[in-house]
């Protein structure tokens, strides 16, 4: 089953399914008709020799320079060559794939003036899983993601690099091996490829998919810790959460009770102590707030995924043709959302690290051995895993600083305010990876802690998780290289975000 694109109703869930099931894309006929109509308008502009930005003129400061008609195609090719100034390591293959899908989807709205040949080239790259090599640094997030999208565009015309079947190679060689011609850019098409927010948005989509799964995984991992510390279940009672008027908080509380149902390790208030520390007692409030952030981010990302963020935009309404220069390429809405994502997801690791501390600290972990060491003194046990978690959490605090509060003028001060949304997206994904590793550390330690408490006392649902993860995380019987355990759990958690 293919993902049908129409420029209007693409969702994050559909992207997730496409990645998980290795789906292809196809274009609905109505959308293709819109593409053809908008291209006809561009062709008419050229035939009538009208002065229109980016079609018959130069770009940015050169917008007043008229271009000779026989140079229109050169103009577009020069644009993507000169703008391909990306720096550093490339976005991963999933981000490159989503970037192509999102750029294609916005063209299908019929406001970009591209040819059906360009649409078909994007479909070919997507379905063949030819991933453009797109350096992740170098975008200001307005006028859109110019540098990253220029690298994407280069691949389509056979001048860039791609990853194909796991091998980094020249795009021209891959196209030749597949008997596919490079695309020849027509008037407006270079600009239509690079004027948009698809780099920041695609990285944001991948961050969201993985962060959402981590938010759910954080609950069962916390439930293991809760049982290891004989946590009090009363704090998750629905009465408490209904009066907070937060559906996300209530949902987390209900799921925590579900994870803990039937456990003989949990306690009631007053049984061992009256109250738990906040990192246990306030899981619904903290994790629930993160879900609120995720819901907000999802709404903003899906809005942008189906937006026309080209410039200029072409309209054909009521027999009137309009070509309007605007600023839909400005990434401010996405930048704000991704900065919010950074904060909301960071807190999942912040509170996780505090639970880790309670598991390993002999002054806080009840009758568990210090650092869960099999032989305290001779063996350090989980001591440095807590250090690693603390380091990642502190790094997240720096990364969570909002990128969108910064701006720097560019293009001779014509583009005098920019979003920095792509910086927010890159930092956001680094935070997601850090959070995943912190939760992996809590998981490794909590597995050992509940084993010491007695696996038979666990709730049925968390016992199943214990058994699942013990398949590849052995008990701690002596000191070993725990970084291997952390990595295998982190990788497993990541794969769970894309389960088929």
UniProtKB/Swiss-Prot annotation:
It is an enzyme of class 4 (lyase). It is found in: Cytoplasm. It catalyses: L-histidine = trans-urocanate + NH4(+). GO terms for biological process: L-histidine catabolic process to glutamate and formamide; L-histidine catabolic process to glutamate and formate. Its EC number is 4.3.1.3. GO terms for cellular component: cytoplasm. There is a cross-link at residues 142-144 (5-imidazolinone (Ala-Gly)). PANTHER family: HISTIDINE AMMONIA-LYASE. Belongs to the PAL/histidase family. This is Histidine ammonia-lyase. It comes from Macrococcus caseolyticus (strain JCSC5402). The gene is hutH.
């Amino acid at each position: 089953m293919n993902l049908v694109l129409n420029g209007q109703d693409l969702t994050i869930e559909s992207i997730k399914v496409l990645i998980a099931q290795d789906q292809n894309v196809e274009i609905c006929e109505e959308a293709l008709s819109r593409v053809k109509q908008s291209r006809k308008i561009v062709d008419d502009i050229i035939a009538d020799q009208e002065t229109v930005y980016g079609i018959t003129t130069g770009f940015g400061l050169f917008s007043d320079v008229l271009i000779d008609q026989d140079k229109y195609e050169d103009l577009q090719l020069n644009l993507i060559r000169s703008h391909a100034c990306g720096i550093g390591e490339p976005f991963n293959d999933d981000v490159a794939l989503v970037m192509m899908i999102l750029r294609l989807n916005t063209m299908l709205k019929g406001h970009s003036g591209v040819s059906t040949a360009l649409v078909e080239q994007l479909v070919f790259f997507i379905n063949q899983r030819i991933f453009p090599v797109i350096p992740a640094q170098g975008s200001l997030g307005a006028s859109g993601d110019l540098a990253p999208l220029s690298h994407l565009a280069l691949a389509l015309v056979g001048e860039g690099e791609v990853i194909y079947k796991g091998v980094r190679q020249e795009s021209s060689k891959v196209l030749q091996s597949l008997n596919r011609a490079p695309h020849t850019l027509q008037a407006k098409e270079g600009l239509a490829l690079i004027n948009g927010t698809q780099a920041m948005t695609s990285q944001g989509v991948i961050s969201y998919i993985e962060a959402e799964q981590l938010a759910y995984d954080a609950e069962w991992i916390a439930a293991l810790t809760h049982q290891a510390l004989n946590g009090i279940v009363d704090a998750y009672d629905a009465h408490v959460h209904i009066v907070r008027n937060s559906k996300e908080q209530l949902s987390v509380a209900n799921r925590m009770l579900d994870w803990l149902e039937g456990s003989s390790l949990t306690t009631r208030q007053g049984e061992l102590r009256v109250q738990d520390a906040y990192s246990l007692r306030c899981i619904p409030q903290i994790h629930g707030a993160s879900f609120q952030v995720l819901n907000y981010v999802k709404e903003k990302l899906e809005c942008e995924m189906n937006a026309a963020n080209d410039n200029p935009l072409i309209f054909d309404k009521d027999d009137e043709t309009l070509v309007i220069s605007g600023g839909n390429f400005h990434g401010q809405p996405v930048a704000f959302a991704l900065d919010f994502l950074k904060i909301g997801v960071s807190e999942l690791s912040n509170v996780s690290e505090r639970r880790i501390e309670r598991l390993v600290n002999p002054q806080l972990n009840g009758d568990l051995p210090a650092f869960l060491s099999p032989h305290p003194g001779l063996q350090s046990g989980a001591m440095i895993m807590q250090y690693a978690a603390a380091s990642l959490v502190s790094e997240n605090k720096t990364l969570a600083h909002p990128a969108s509060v910064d701006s720097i003028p560019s293009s001779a001060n014509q583009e005098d305010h920019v979003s920095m949304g792509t910086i927010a997206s890159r930092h956001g994904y680094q935070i997601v990876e850090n959070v995943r590793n912190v939760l992996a550390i809590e998981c490794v330690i909590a597995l050992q802690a509940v084993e010491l408490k007695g696996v038979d006392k666990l709730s049925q649902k968390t016992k199943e998780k214990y058994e699942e993860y013990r398949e590849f995380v052995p008990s701690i019987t002596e000191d070993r290289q725990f970084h291997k355990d952390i990595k295998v759990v982190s990788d497993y958690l990541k794969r769970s975000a894309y389960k088929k």
